[in-house]
């Protein structure tokens, strides 16, 4: 008698419903983000009375709930007001004017040829689709810094901002980024027209991470299928990665799959540690292609120190690198690496030196070393 290789998959495993651990999952409730939810909702509320929404700039470290919070509010708003249409675009994938305009058209069910149309033609197609559908769009540009690096980004945002003025369509824009100074990259004219309200997302505390993970795990796994220490370890690992809840949730998903593949009855700490080895911190993967040689050298030096004062780090850098930079430029690079959630910086008082800054890695040293190989 033939037995299917998938028969064992039908037997009860560890997962009750692993979708609760997927990156795109939006919970019914978002703990510890109540104030940000209220701010975003309040900014979009004018749409309910056919008014113009407040544009938003949302920033904070990776895994602090920026994306899921924005999508949560949009989901609630779409359910409450059928005319509202949320359009989410990840600019890490779509990072040029043409790519974003194509995605906007597609979101309205109006696919355009991938080649052959100029940007202005695609823009006109988008405006036409908005009029036909009679919707009020909220355009969410996640990883907005990836888009703004492109020279056509300012023109794209200017086009979107003028839709209300030229076509009487109330369109809102939400920019999301890890980097505080993202808006400073924009053309002055566009930044002024955008007039975005800034909403900051801070890192989750270890205790908050535990509560978030407990809730996800309760829905994702069978009650007796996960060892009690797993959640604490996942939260501790996320805390090491600057409170990145996404890393912890991805680790639980990967660990559960490892456990099932091994035929284990329970998800254990051993499975979780194996998962950690496979998952590279997202902040590093996203940032590395955009770091210059100076920033990479700073990270190489930091991997040799648990912590170091800023003056000592500058001296170490100057002794290694032929490319001289001023202390101010060096400080700017440290600040950028901190904004990217790779370094942690805190004000400190050192004997003799007086006030200074203490620099530490905000991501696992091993992951940084691995990603810097070959540079």
Residue spans for each PLM region:
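Post-Walker A helix-loop "phosphate-sensing" segment adjacent to the P-loop in P-loop NTPases
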Residues: 75-85, 109-112
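Conserved catalytic segments around the Walker B and adjacent sensor/switch elements
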Residues: 55-57, 79-93, 197
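A short, basic N-terminal segment
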Residues: 1-53
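Conserved C-terminal helix/linker of AAA+ ATPases
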Residues: 258-283
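Mid-core helix/loop region of P-loop NTP-binding domains shared across ATPases and GTPases
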Residues: 2, 9-17, 22, 70, ...
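Short alpha-helical segments that sit at the start of domains
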Residues: 276-299
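Terminal-proximal interaction/regulatory segments of ATP-powered molecular machines
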Residues: 305-375
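Walker A/P-loop nucleotide-binding motif
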Residues: 50-73, 93
């Amino acid at each position: 008698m033939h037995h299917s290789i998938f028969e064992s998959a039908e037997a009860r495993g560890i997962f009750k419903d692993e979708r609760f651990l997927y990156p795109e999952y939006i919970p019914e409730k978002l703990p510890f983000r109540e104030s940000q939810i209220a701010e975003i909702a309040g900014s979009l509320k004018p749409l309910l009375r056919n008014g113009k929404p407040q544009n938003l700039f949302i920033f904070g470290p990776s895994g602090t709930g920026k994306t899921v919070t924005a999508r949560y509010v949009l989901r609630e708003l779409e359910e409450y007001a059928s005319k509202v249409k949320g359009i989410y675009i990840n600019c890490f994938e779509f990072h040029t004017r043409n790519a974003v305009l194509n995605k906007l058209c597609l979101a309205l069910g109006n696919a355009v040829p991938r080649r052959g149309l100029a940007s202005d033609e695609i823009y006109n197609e988008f405006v036409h689709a908005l009029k036909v559908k009679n919707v009020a769009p909220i355009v969410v540009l996640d990883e907005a810094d990836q888009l703004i690096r492109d020279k056509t980004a300012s023109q794209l945002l200017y086009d979107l901002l003028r839709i209300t003025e030229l076509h009487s369509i109330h369109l809102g824009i939400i920019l999301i980024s890890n980097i505080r100074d993202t808006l400073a990259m924009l053309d002055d004219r566009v930044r002024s027209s955008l007039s975005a309200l800034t909403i900051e997302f801070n890192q989750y505390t270890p205790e908050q991470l535990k509560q978030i993970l407990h809730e996800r795990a309760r829905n994702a796994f069978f009650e007796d299928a996960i060892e009690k220490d797993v959640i604490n370890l996942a939260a501790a690992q996320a805390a090491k990665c600057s409170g990145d809840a996404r890393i912890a949730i991805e680790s639980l998903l990967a660990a559960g799959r490892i456990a099932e593949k091994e035929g284990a009855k329970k998800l254990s700490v051993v499975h979780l540690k194996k998962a950690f080895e496979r998952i590279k911190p997202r902040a590093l993967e996203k940032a590395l292609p955009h770091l210059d040689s100076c920033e990479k050298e700073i990270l190489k030096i930091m991997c040799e120190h648990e912590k170091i004062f800023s003056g000592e780090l500058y001296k170490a850098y100057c002794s290694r690198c032929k490319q001289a930079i001023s202390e101010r430029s060096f400080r700017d690079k440290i600040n950028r690496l901190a904004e990217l959630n790779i370094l942690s910086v805190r004000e400190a008082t050192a004997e003799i030196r007086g006030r200074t800054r203490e620099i530490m890695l905000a991501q696992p040293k091993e992951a940084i070393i691995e990603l810097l190989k070959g540079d």
